């Protein structure tokens, strides 16, 4: 399983180390007041590699005047970006641009060593972007993201966190995929009383 924090950057500068396949977050700040930015504005960023490859990612409103876009560069080298806002008068969001260099990943996570997953040429398997086979060994943890799952304690003496213990065990066992249900309906506890999901 792959776990790694995002690269959270309020702005990119030439000193920052952007690594291939790692998620990069760039923040933009609106200059104007928008009564309902979530529904009334759209913001996209087009990322262009020095080879000419172009990828467009939607940005998202993050409250107040903050907008963010996340991008994981699939190629090494120089990338530039330009934003396009549905309100061309919004100077803090429209036609913002910048550049950054992407370097090789130096960590141990296979996702960043070999790239995102894709369907193999014969359409029978999953493989990483560089062709490395991906072995899907997964577990579905139906209560993993609900109040039924204990984050701060555990009913198993081996683990301080019930949730953390399950993740640790699956990593130890070589699992590559973990899934959980976000919406499973109302479940009752042992006494028959309903408990909150969150």
Task: Spell out what each predicted region is.
Residues 2-15:
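Short, compositionally biased P/S/T/A/G/V-rich stretches that sit at domain boundaries
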Residues 15-19, 150:
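N-terminal start-of-chain detector that recognizes signal peptides
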Residues 1-2, 79:
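Intrinsic structural disorder
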Residues 47-49:
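Conserved aromatic beta-strand anchor motif in extracellular beta-sandwich/beta-rich domains
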Residues 54-70, 78-82, 91, 109-198:
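Active-site-adjacent substrate/metal-binding segments within catalytic domains
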Residues 20-25, 30, 34-44, 55-102:
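Ligand-binding face of N-terminal immunoglobulin V-set domains in extracellular IgSF glycoproteins
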Residues 103-109:
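Extracellular interdomain linker/stem segments of modular secreted and single-pass surface proteins
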Residues 11-14, 44, 121-123:
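Intrinsically disordered, low-complexity boundary segments flanking structured domains
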């Amino acid at each position: 399983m792959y776990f790694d924090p995002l690269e959270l950057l309020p702005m990119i500068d030439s000193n920052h180390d952007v690594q291939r396949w790692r998620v990069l977050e760039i923040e933009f700040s609106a200059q104007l007041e928008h009564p309902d930015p979530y529904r009334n504005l759209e913001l996209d960023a087009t990322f262009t590699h020095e080879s000419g490859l172009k990828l467009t990612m939607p940005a998202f409103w993050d409250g107040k005047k903050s907008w963010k876009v996340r991008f994981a560069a699939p190629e090494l080298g120089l990338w530039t970006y330009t934003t396009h806002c549905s309100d061309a008068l919004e100077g803090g969001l429209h036609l913002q641009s910048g550049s950054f260099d992407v370097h090789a990943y130096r960590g141990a996570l296979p996702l960043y060593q070999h790239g995102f997953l894709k369907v193999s040429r014969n359409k029978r398997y999953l493989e990483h972007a560089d062709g490395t086979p991906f072995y899907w060994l997964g577990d579905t943890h139906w209560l993993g993201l609900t109040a039924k799952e204990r984050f701060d304690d555990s009913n198993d003496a081996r683990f301080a966190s019930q949730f953390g213990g399950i993740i640790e065990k699956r990593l130890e066992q070589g699992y590559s995929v973990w899934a959980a249900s976000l919406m499973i309906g109302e479940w009752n506890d042992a006494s028959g009383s309903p408990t909150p999901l969150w």
